[in-house]
Amino acid sequence: MEVLSVKDLKFSYYLNETDTFHALQNITFSVEQGEMVLFCGLCGCGKTTLLKLLKEEIRPDGKMEGEIENRYGSMQTGYLFQNPEQQIVCRTVEEELVFGAENMDMPRDEMARSAAELAAYLGIEKMLHESTQSLSGGQKQILNLASLLMMKPRILLLDEPVSQLDPVCTWEFMNLLKKVREDFGLTILVAEHNLDLFLPEADKVIYMENGRINYQGKKDLFIRKMFQEEKKFVESLPETVKLYHEAGGTEEWPFAAATLIKALNQEQRKVLFPEDLELEESLGGQEVILIRGGYFRYEKNGRDILRDLDLSLYSGRIYGLIGGNGAGKSTLLSVLLGYRRFYRGKYQANPGMALLPQNPAYAFLKDTLMDDCRMIASVERIEELLNEDVFFSDVRQWLSKNPLDLSGGQMQKAAVFKILLKDPDILLLDEPVKALDGYEKEVFLQLLKRMKEKGKMILVVSHDLEFLQRVADECLFLYDGKISAQEACGRMFVNNRFYTTVKGKIKGMLQDESFITN
């Protein structure tokens, strides 16, 4: 049964009183009851714009043409935002859970019964009376999903729902999503760069390019088409699929590490997964950040967010910082930059430090990107950086735009451009690739490596472990307020079970003789 139909949809944003930007052109597709449809494409292709147009209350301001027919209407269509913070409005979890239902005038006895039943079903009873601000990012996103389910939706629209979640929270969220889809027969439309998670679950893939649909259909044909035609987007495909293709595979694409191993012969395994790990030799360089016995808390009588922290970071290296949501990673960056201070311990840092905030919107103050950049750099310096690296090749066309009007990936690139105008020697990056497609990640990776060669020290906080394995010299694991592990990324990911990569997981399996025997 068809539950959603879009015919010849066109949409343009108003840039000013006379100019418009054509974001979507001739969009036509339909969705069947219970389907999961994955929308994907390079940054700025129009995924989020399309998703928002399907939910009447949050449609962006602009000119829309064409037809959108929703069998269930907007009231039974829930929208989950990328940023967990963006959707929460109440003080406690219990208040947030019923907030939407209250606004729909659900009878109080029905609302109380539904809240109790849903909390038990999702396993969130223990956090009902907690403050929403005390929750981790993963808990907030699960609460957002629960709040939507309270309103008994038939269709869910998800905009990069796990991009800001750590691996464990992502696993929990995906399991819950599968559960509610199967139990309630929900129809799910998701816009996502992380195809590793959603492509295996998708019934249909819609690939967008420059505001148009370039492909819609089954995922097997989609993967084959990407390898044949869309070279840029290949970087966004699941790691297992790329490795299988590298080994010569062309069909029956594996989405799990164990499935990939079984599909490869012994010689292919040796080529793709050599036994040698990265050597942890000294890379030299000058110590640019030193912490000994650092303690930090937000309130005088509160708990320590960082405690007995020791850390030494050196020039000419790239470090990855990982850990769970709420572990204190962003707090540590704010202390390093001087926004906050340890109340006990020793801290020394060289000058010339810059921070890319987790929310790139915080990097901008003016109405145009050019005005923002002119606050800290000359026109000559702006022009120099525009021509310096291919990562910034499309930034020039955004200079006259309000940076807050850019897509998530475009805003991320614009924020990186702005902070690099000062040519910092120490660069702190908080989730820098969360809104970038695979191709943009690869170009950004090469930019960071060139900066490393110039002697820069770069600390990258990210939940994208595949990216960290390729870019970082060492990974630091922040747990319980201190660095619990620090070693070469390849070695760490082989030893880890949850905070790991596809290659790390497979190398760990290949070291397990019982697994290979079976």
Residue ranges, per PLM feature:
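H-loop/switch region of ABC-family ATPase nucleotide-binding domains
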Residues: 192-193, 462-463
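Conserved ABC ATPase signature
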Residues: 131-135, 402-406, 410
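Conserved beta-strand-loop-alpha-helix hinge in the C-terminal portion
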Residues: 212-240, 482-505
